[in-house]
């Protein structure tokens, strides 16, 4: 292989290595196994005839020559994106946008956003996949989606974020539960209870566990009932399987009918920020920018 055989995979690796600072972190950004990324870098160095990165026990970093090549690689990637947009425009297409959204956003906000997008951006083709916050980051890293929406506290490197709105989580119980008749419930009581929670990787679960950790004894290992969706969580709480922690948006119908009751827990902070997220290594596409502008206009009223 010669340098003339390099393709976008090679340029993406250099761009990610410049951003992440190590071959392992660059591999994670690209959704590659580290050995595969290392082999790709080795083949690039052989074809270039000089070292692109310095290896050490602390990781890998680009050499001075590597930084020059990485800067040019970034320009190539930006040009490739512009070519894609130009071809779409010349073909008279409105473009496409592939979104992966966490459950709360997908179930309670995305339908209105998509309906408005159909009216205001009729030529834009949108595909929506749904998962938890961890899977959103995974899909973005592997490059299979353009834009994500997450609801957890985790801020991962290699991404741009746009804060959208605040979402409050509530501790809820059935109307017949003893806590429903109390003015307040202690945070330590909630932390030690058998709670119905979302699965690991869910933003709802992350926020709940972080908030409850400060009120949980070090030796304690409270039991949890894990469910894979907001609807399953609400139904499990209503069936008496235990108190639950869930977004206000997901449980508002049950609160209005009195089927479930929100419990006041002084000192337990369960607020979170819903965010849009996209890879920092990829220029923001016209389609992504248009959809984000639409979302902001709907939120800001």
Regions found by a protein language model. Give the residues of each.
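A late-sequence structural motif
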Residues: 109, 261-301
């Amino acid at each position: 292989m010669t340098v003339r055989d390099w393709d976008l995979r090679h340029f993406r690796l250099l761009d990610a290595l410049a951003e992440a600072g190590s071959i392992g972190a660059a591999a994670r950004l690209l959704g590659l196994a580290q050995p595969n990324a290392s082999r790709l870098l080795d083949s690039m160095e052989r074809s270039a005839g000089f070292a692109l990165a310095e290896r050490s026990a602390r990781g890998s970093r680009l050499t001075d020559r590597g930084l020059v090549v990485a800067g040019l690689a970034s320009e190539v990637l930006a040009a490739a994106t512009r070519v894609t947009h130009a071809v779409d425009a010349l073909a008279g297409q409105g473009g496409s946008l592939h979104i992966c959204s966490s459950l709360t956003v997908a179930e309670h906000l995305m339908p209105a956003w998509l309906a408005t997008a159909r009216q205001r951006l009729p030529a834009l083709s949108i595909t929506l996949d749904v998962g938890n916050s961890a899977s959103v980051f995974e899909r973005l890293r592997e490059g299979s989606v353009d834009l994500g929406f997450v609801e957890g506290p985790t801020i991962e490197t290699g991404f741009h974020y746009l804060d959208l709105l605040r979402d409050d989580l509530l501790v809820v119980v059935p109307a017949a539960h003893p806590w429903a008749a109390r003015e307040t419930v202690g945070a330590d009581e909630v932390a030690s209870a058998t709670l119905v929670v979302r699965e690991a990787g869910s933003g709802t679960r992350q926020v709940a566990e972080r908030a409850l950790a400060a009120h949980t004894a070090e030796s304690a290992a409270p039991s949890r009932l894990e469910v894979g969706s907001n609807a399953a969580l609400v139904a499990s709480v209503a069936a008496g399987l235990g108190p639950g922690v869930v977004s206000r948006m997901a449980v508002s119908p049950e609160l209005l009918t009195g089927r479930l009751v929100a419990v006041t827990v002084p000192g337990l902070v369960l607020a979170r920020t819903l965010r849009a997220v996209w890879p920092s290594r990829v220029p923001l596409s016209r389609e992504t920018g248009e959809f984000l502008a639409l979302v902001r206009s709907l939120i800001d009223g």
